[in-house]
Amino acid sequence: MRIADYSVTKAVLERHGFTFKKSFGQNFLTDTNILQKIVDTAEINKNVNVIEIGPGIGALTEFLAENASEVMAFEIDERLVPILEDTLRDHDNVKVINEDVLKADLQTRVKEFENPDLPIKVVANLPYYITTPILMHLIESKIPFSEFVVMMQKEVADRISAEPNTKAYGSLSIAVQYYMTAKVAFAVPRTVFVPAPNVDSAILKMTRRKQPLVEVKDEDFFFRVSKASFLHRRKTLWNNLTSHFGKSEEVKNKLDQALENAAIKPSIRGEALSISDFARLSDALREAGL
């Protein structure tokens, strides 16, 4: 019997008198086939260390521990720590850390792996309410995670992996794809969770690029420009950029010059620009003194 078997999950929760907290976005997966598929998608083996976020009662952790060298699981809810100690007692390669991963000193934590030189993958069923902050925190950290295989709301997975000229494409697509390739591996129905969430989920597989997708002179400015370009999706690039940088004649002249230098039409919408276009645009805007 597996932790994820519905009867086992139910028994564990009853034995420990556990009640779900909405504020932590807790939804426990009760489908062993999907858990195996996650591990297979992540290609976990004994030459890989894994960081898991939000292990819950250990359903995914159990599968990870059987396949990985070590698993470091960050759990914010202290009530789940004794439950995890119970459910994972047969696995000595799991370290449960009762800490908010957004506040954790990850640089120090990853040195606590017995073999810290092994590749590190992030495999997790992320809380929906905080998926994007956690992802960006991990991606932008100086830790060279080789891969992320994470469960999230399907809508967010679609946005992250979206291509230009689609409804889902936006600043989040650019922020992630700048650093990583992103592909939806498979969908997960809401019916396989306890309690069932109000949305469907998907597994997103992201692999770190050896170098960022494009070269830019100022990364922070590049992300600022891409965000500003999607301020109002139905507005033109020109309207969004003047809303962000200002509407004085001086600013408009600089914008005109930058768009001309970048060979981008002011009447276009942000969703029509590729990440390479945004790189060219942000460098031209920076050059123009904006």
Swiss-Prot record:
Q: Which gene encodes it?
A: rsmA
**UniProt KW Cell cycle keyword:** no
Q: Which Gene Ontology cellular-component terms appear in the entry?
A: cytosol
> What's this chain's function?
Specifically dimethylates two adjacent adenosines (A1518 and A1519) in the loop of a conserved hairpin near the 3'-end of 16S rRNA in the 30S particle. May play a critical role in biogenesis of 30S subunits.
UniProt cross-references to InterPro entries, sorted A to Z = KsgA/Erm (IPR001737), rRNA_Ade_diMease-like_C (IPR023165), rRNA_Ade_Mease_Trfase_CS (IPR020596), rRNA_Ade_methylase_Trfase_N (IPR020598), rRNA_adenine_dimethylase (IPR011530), SAM-dependent_MTases_sf (IPR029063)
Q: What is its EC number?
A: 2.1.1.182
Q: Which reaction does it catalyse?
A: adenosine(1518)/adenosine(1519) in 16S rRNA + 4 S-adenosyl-L-methionine = N(6)-dimethyladenosine(1518)/N(6)-dimethyladenosine(1519) in 16S rRNA + 4 S-adenosyl-L-homocysteine + 4 H(+)
Q: Which GO terms describe its molecular function?
A: 16S rRNA (adenine(1518)-N(6)/adenine(1519)-N(6))-dimethyltransferase activity; RNA binding
Q: What class of enzyme is it?
A: transferase
Q: Which NCBIfam families match?
A: ksgA
Annotated residues that bind S-adenosyl-L-methionine are located at: 27, 29, 54, 75, 100, 125
| Name listed for the protein in its UniProt record | Ribosomal RNA small subunit methyltransferase A
- Do you know which PANTHER family this protein is assigned to? DIMETHYLADENOSINE TRANSFERASE, DIMETHYLADENOSINE TRANSFERASE-RELATED
- Give the family this protein belongs to, as stated in its UniProt record: Belongs to the class I-like SAM-binding methyltransferase superfamily. rRNA adenine N(6)-methyltransferase family. RsmA subfamily.
* Principal location listed in the UniProt entry: cytoplasm
Keywords of the record, alphabetical order, are: Cytoplasm, Methyltransferase, RNA-binding, rRNA processing, S-adenosyl-L-methionine, Transferase
- Any single Pfam family the record assigns to this protein: RrnaAD
- Where in or outside the cell? Cytoplasm
